């Protein structure tokens, strides 16, 4: 099995040294991601492309590699190819006839050939020879150079012949690690997830900082969003997840700050804490999901007042983005369904929030605040490697049992997304398997027959453990985790 990976055009426009550096980083990222699924994968860097090879030809492995390549930043598109050798142009024609002849019946077609190396024929010569032969020896409706129903793409590279079976779109952007690291203030909502994704796509390693205002269930949901982003788009690099216990700060604000100023003061306290954490991590900037005018605290005046509390660069990738566009993007990247299940936890709700904060008034309110509390909660914040989320969950809920065998009255509940389940179906002989995506569990699990025991399944066992914890905390004891 072979894939030809094409680099994002902005990479190709860079100077030679920069292009070389970006290409090598992308090669390493692809290798890191793919070899965890297939140890036989070889990743070879050429001047304008990256070759991915593997001896594992299984349909499941192919689907996994396609999914991973399509989610790796820095790739414009990649080609799924079949490789062979040839002797002459007639051999190229005969191999092409064997590959695509039956599919041309009743269809118009054209042949496109890219040629690399020294040959006694040109690319146009090859296209005419192969196309003419197919036109004469199949039941096609004829050659159509513009707008054909079928385009046959071949590549002749010296003595090798490549049939391009399918072209897959890539994610675009820059390879992860080509830009400086950043810290995302993630809440679990639509906005912070999408803003984090945009920086990942642009080549930054994104660490996650969560201000816990809503207890354990809220944190679990936010971990799901962060893990989804890392697992799908950024798993070539290690990142941190930090949960800052912000309840004491909220309590202090509720007690000492005027109602109308609470929202801006809370955001300033978050920026203070995030700046401290970012400095400890050695990152270059903070990211938020704020969009201009979306809520009362997100006016230009308020954002300016909020930013003055930190000397660190604060990035807002969504500042001029409509809410519906943000939600649509969240659905594409797979975080929307999780965000929809996360309640809005806000310990500070102003009845009449200010939309034009005055620095003098805000500073007057903050004089009442014990700012040492910020450093205290930052010092208390647990920092974990996002890959260890599964282990952290295991420590939190030892009562959630993981099983690999089945007993009577047990049903395997596949909680993967529909696309993932279709790409790699779970089929266990003699066992009842039902599908309920993880983002529907909170609302629909209670509608299932509760006299059954449900074994939650996902590919890596992380989301299933997180969901098992959520269901246990919600009072459901009839859940386990299935790990084959």
Curated annotation (Swiss-Prot):
Entry-linked SUPFAM superfamilies: Adenine nucleotide alpha hydrolases-like, Rhodanese/Cell cycle control phosphatase, THUMP domain-like
Start and end of every THUMP domain? 63-167
Q: Name one GO biological process term.
A: thiamine biosynthetic process
* Keyword terms: ATP-binding, Cytoplasm, Disulfide bond, Nucleotide-binding, Redox-active center, RNA-binding, Thiamine biosynthesis, Transferase, tRNA-binding
InterPro entries for the chain: Rhodanese-like_dom, Rhodanese-like_dom_sf, Rossmann-like_a/b/a_fold, ThiI_AANH, ThiI_fer, ThiI_N, THII_Thiazole_biosynth_dom, THUMP_dom
- Give one GO term, molecular function aspect: CCA tRNA nucleotidyltransferase activity
Question: What cellular component terms from Gene Ontology apply here?
Answer: cytosol
What is the active site of this protein?
A: 458
The membrane-spanning stretches of this chain are none
Q: What is its main location?
A: cytoplasm
Q: Does the keyword RNA-binding apply?
A: yes
Which is a Pfam family this sequence falls into?
Answer: THUMP
Residue positions annotated to bind ATP are 185-186, 267, 289, 298
What reaction(s) does this enzyme catalyze? [ThiI sulfur-carrier protein]-S-sulfanyl-L-cysteine + a uridine in tRNA + 2 reduced [2Fe-2S]-[ferredoxin] + ATP + H(+) = [ThiI sulfur-carrier protein]-L-cysteine + a 4-thiouridine in tRNA + 2 oxidized [2Fe-2S]-[ferredoxin] + AMP + diphosphate; [ThiS sulfur-carrier protein]-C-terminal Gly-Gly-AMP + S-sulfanyl-L-cysteinyl-[cysteine desulfurase] + AH2 = [ThiS sulfur-carrier protein]-C-terminal-Gly-aminoethanethioate + L-cysteinyl-[cysteine desulfurase] + A + AMP + 2 H(+)
Question: Where is it localised?
Answer: Cytoplasm
Q: In which pathway does it act?
A: Cofactor biosynthesis; thiamine diphosphate biosynthesis
Which NCBIfam families does the annotation name? ThiI_C_thiazole (TIGR04271), tRNA uracil 4-sulfurtransferase ThiI (TIGR00342)
What family is this protein classified in?
Belongs to the ThiI family.
Summarizing the function annotation, the protein's role is: Catalyzes the ATP-dependent transfer of a sulfur to tRNA to produce 4-thiouridine in position 8 of tRNAs, which functions as a near-UV photosensor. Also catalyzes the transfer of sulfur to the sulfur carrier protein ThiS, forming ThiS-thiocarboxylate. This is a step in the synthesis of thiazole, in the thiamine biosynthesis pathway. The sulfur is donated as persulfide by IscS.
Q: What protein am I looking at? A: tRNA sulfurtransferase
- Organism of origin is Psychromonas ingrahamii (strain DSM 17664 / CCUG 51855 / 37)
């Amino acid at each position: 099995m072979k894939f030809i990976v094409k680099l994002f055009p902005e990479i190709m426009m860079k100077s030679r040294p920069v292009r070389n550096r970006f290409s090598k980083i992308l090669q390493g990222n692809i290798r890191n991601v793919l070899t965890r699924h297939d140890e036989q994968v070889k990743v070879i860097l050429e001047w304008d492309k990256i070759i991915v090879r593997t001896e594992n030809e299984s349909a499941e492995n192919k689907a996994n590699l396609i999914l991973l390549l399509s989610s790796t930043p820095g790739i414009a598109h990649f080609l799924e190819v079949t490789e062979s050798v040839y002797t002459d142009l007639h051999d190229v024609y005969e191999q092409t006839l064997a590959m695509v002849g039956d599919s041309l019946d009743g269809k118009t077609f054209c042949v496109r050939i890219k040629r690399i190396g020294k040959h006694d024929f040109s690319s146009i010569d090859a296209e005419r020879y192969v196309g003419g032969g197919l036109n004469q020896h199949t039941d096609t409706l004829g050659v159509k150079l513009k707008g054909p129903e079928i385009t046959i793409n071949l590549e002749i590279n010296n003595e090798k012949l490549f049939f391009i079976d399918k072209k897959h779109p890539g994610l675009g952007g820059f390879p992860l690690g080509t830009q400086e690291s950043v810290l995302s203030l993630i809440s679990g909502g639509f906005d912070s997830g999408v803003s984090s994704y945009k920086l990942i796509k642009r080549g930054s390693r994104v660490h996650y900082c969560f201000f816990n205002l809503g207890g354990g269930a809220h944190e679990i949901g936010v971990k799901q969003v962060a893990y989804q982003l890392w697992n799908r788009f950024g798993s070539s690099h290690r990142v941190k997840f930090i949960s800052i216990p912000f309840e004491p700060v909220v309590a202090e604000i509720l007690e000492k700050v005027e109602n109308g100023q609470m929202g801006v003061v809370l955001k300033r306290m978050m920026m203070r804490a995030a700046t401290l954490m970012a400095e400890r991590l050695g990152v270059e900037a903070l990211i938020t999901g704020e969009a201009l005018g979306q809520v009362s605290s997100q006016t230009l005046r308020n954002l300016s007042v909020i930013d003055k509390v930190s000397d660190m660069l604060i990035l807002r990738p969504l500042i001029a983005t409509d809410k519906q566009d943000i939600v649509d993007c969240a659905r594409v990247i797979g975080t929307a369904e999780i965000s929809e299940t996360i309640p809005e936890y806000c310990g500070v709700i102003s009845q009449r929030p200010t939309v034009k904060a005055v620095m003098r008034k805000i500073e007057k309110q903050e004089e009442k605040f014990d700012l040492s509390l910020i450093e205290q909660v930052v010092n208390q914040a647990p920092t974990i490697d996002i890959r260890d989320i599964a282990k952290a969950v295991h420590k939190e809920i030892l009562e959630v049992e993981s099983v690999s065998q089945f007993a009577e009255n047990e049903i395997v509940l596949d909680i993967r997304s529909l696309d993932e389940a279709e790409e790699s179906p779970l089929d266990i002989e003699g066992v009842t398997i039902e599908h309920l995506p993880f983002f529907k569990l909170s609302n629909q699990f209670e509608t299932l027959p509760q006299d059954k025991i449900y074994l939650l399944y996902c590919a890596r066992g992380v989301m299933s453990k997180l969901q098992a914890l959520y269901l246990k905390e919600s009072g459901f004891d009839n859940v386990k985790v299935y790990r084959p």
